[in-house]
Amino acid sequence: MISFYEWITTKYRTKSGDFKDNRFGDLARDVYRDRNFPAASTDKEEISGYLRRCGACGPCMETFEAAWKKYAKEN
């Protein structure tokens, strides 16, 4: 199983290397730029806890939940 970090930063990039212009691309860009993000994690609670501790807003958490559902289906 690949990590959530690897999945989202790969799935939501364009062929040119930019992040897609949607809420999932925005989350992927934020995750990519965060040097402290638990990049090796495949654990939903660990990642959501990290996002909450970092002060993620409601829409960000909603996007994470939706992205996690897609990630879980594909992995």
Predicted feature descriptions by range:
Residues 1, 72-75:
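Short intrinsically disordered terminal tails
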Residues 2-26:
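N-terminal acidic leader/helix
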Residues 11, 30, 67:
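Short acidic/histidine-centered micro-motifs embedded in hydrophobic/aromatic stretches
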Residues 15, 34, 38, 58, ...:
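Short secondary-structure junctions and interdomain/linker hinges
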Residues 18-41:
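A short, structured beta-strand/loop element
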Residues 38-69:
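Short, charged early-sequence alpha-helical segments and their helix-coil boundaries
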